[in-house]
From Swiss-Prot:
Keywords: Cytoplasm, DNA-directed RNA polymerase, Nucleotidyltransferase, Transcription, Transferase. Part of the RNA polymerase complex. InterPro entries: RBP11-like (IPR036603), RBP11-like_dimer (IPR009025), RNA_pol_Rpb11_13-16kDa_CS (IPR008193), Rpo11-like (IPR022905). It comes from Haloquadratum walsbyi (strain DSM 16790 / HBSQ001). This is DNA-directed RNA polymerase subunit Rpo11. Its EC number is 2.7.7.6.
């Protein structure tokens, strides 16, 4: 996985997530939408309408009054995904 910031402002972030597909992008988007201060989170695998699939571009918009940096929100969402995976691993191990 390689990340490349395309655009960043106080309330918006667009970042390319090279090497990932819909599976991962849906998980991180879902975690972002549950993160405090995030107004919107989307991704596109064909942002330039090039006629073919490109690397996914994740777009995050935070609420202007929330004082949340979109990059910090992405970090929070990533940690939440890790916590969920750890919880699942523990539950799975206990079940088998």
């Amino acid at each position: 996985m390689e990340l490349r910031v395309i655009e960043r402002t106080d309330t918006e972030l667009r970042i390319e997530v090279a090497g990932e597909d819909h599976t991962f992008m849906n998980v991180i988007k879902g975690a972002l939408l549950q993160t405090d201060g995030v107004a919107a989170a989307t991704y596109d695998v064909n942002p330039e309408q090039s006629g073919g699939q490109t690397e996914p571009v994740l777009s995050i918009q935070t609420e202007p009054d929330a004082d949340v940096d979109p990059l910090d929100a992405l970090g929070d969402a990533s940690r939440q995904v890790q916590t969920t995976v750890d919880d699942f691993t523990s539950a799975f191990t206990a079940a088998v």
